[in-house]
Amino acid sequence: MQKTAPRPPSARISFLSASVLGLGAAVASRGAVFLVNIMLAHSLTVHDFGLFSYAYVTALNLGLFLATGVSQAAGHVLPLTEDPERRRRQLCAFIVLLVALIAVAATALYLSATSISIAAFGSAQGGEALRMAAIVLIATAFTQALQAFLYAMHEHRASASVSIGAALLLLAMLWTMGPIRQPVVALVIFLAINAGAAASQLVILGRTTQNQRGPWRTGRQELRLAFKHALPSVLTTSMGAPVHWICLSMLAAMTDGAHQLALFSVAFQWYIAITFIPATLGNLALPFLARNTGATEAMVRQRFRSALLFGGGLSLALGCMAFLLAGQIFAWLYPAAYGSAAASMRSLAVAAALCGISVLLQQRIAAAGKFWRNFAMAAVYSVIYVAAAYLALRLGYGAPSIGLAMSAAYCCLILFQTLTLQSDSGAAIRLGRSFS
């Protein structure tokens, strides 16, 4: 029986439709995890929640940075690969590279959990939580990257269906269980649902790229191309994980470090929720921008302007809302012990609004093939971030120091990105023609 050919280009949806689907999936998936964290904040003590949040944020940052790095390279290469068989082999190469990176990162985190805990807290009290974080890392990074691969293959509807279905299933299971007393229970449910979502995503990718030549396979040429594009991208995004961990460790080294981490972590969940939206739009925008083979510079500028106005404007609106409603949010949703976290949320709301703009600018530079330029600017951002966090902590700002440092670093990064785009206005056009 002859297999169905991949969907023709005429069935591809517009960027606006893809954005609506992607945002719906992002809101559903992040909202489900967000509610779980609120439930845990009510169930655990502030100290235990601080340890758990430290591990969770470590895993989430490292996992998402790895996934974003690989998916950014895939979103650049796959839309420009016209031959179906070559695209299939190239997609398989990116999946192999992703699995290898996740395995190395998760193993390193698991084996060094005790050492990291001693460096951060002065004791091994967070070692078990970090070992649990290594497992969470596998689930979050793999499903996030597969979702971006689906975007690059134009499967926006299927990707949104999987994300929304997994989120609804997670909420339904937790609702029937009642209050969560042990984080391990929530972890097991989370991993099981992520495994199902990843399996569904792989099935969809298989159907999208099916042909008459048997099972998936890749080769050295595809692996070299994947590594060539993913290396600077992964280095750029992964740089944020250790840098963020250094700043969290400086916060944990304070006299009431675990308490300060808890205050920061509950506010950081709102930062993740806001920045997840421009990150999703970035994963959507990059394939659309990279696909402009033979397009005019005006067309590329117009598509990028639409993405920037939509994603950047939404990030600014959400950041302003979080800044203004920080006090009410913590009064309504969290125990009284977390009331002082509103200050952290305000500083992180400013950082989140700036991050939304920076992410889209970064994707525009990546669409032009300037991956190493992004890496250089990320290195400068990291230095400013650590230096500003150290200074703010020394001045006694406590948990809000991290948000203040991120805001200062993002301001500098946006300035550098804007100057880069002005000097390389036609790079995307030249790059697109080289693939055609």
UniProtKB/Swiss-Prot annotation:
GO biological-process terms attached to the record: polysaccharide transport
Listed name of the protein: EPS I polysaccharide export inner membrane protein EpsE
Entry similarity comment: To E.coli bicyclomycin resistance protein (BCR).
Lineage: Bacteria, Pseudomonadati, Pseudomonadota, Betaproteobacteria, Burkholderiales
Membrane topology (UniProt): Multi-pass membrane protein
Keywords: Cell inner membrane, Cell membrane, Membrane, Plasmid, Polysaccharide transport, Sugar transport, Transmembrane, Transmembrane helix, Transport, Virulence
Disulfide-bonded cysteines: none
Record's keyword annotation contains Transmembrane: yes
Record bears the keyword Phosphoprotein: no
Transmembrane segments: 20-40, 49-69, 91-111, 132-152, 160-180, 184-204, 234-254, 261-281, 307-327, 341-361, 375-395, 396-416
Domain of life: Bacteria
Entry function: Probably involved in polymerization and/or export of exopolysaccharide EPS I which functions as a virulence factor. May play a role in export of EPS I or its intermediates across the membranes.
Location in or out of the cell: Cell inner membrane
Principal subcellular localization: membrane
One Gene Ontology cellular component: plasma membrane
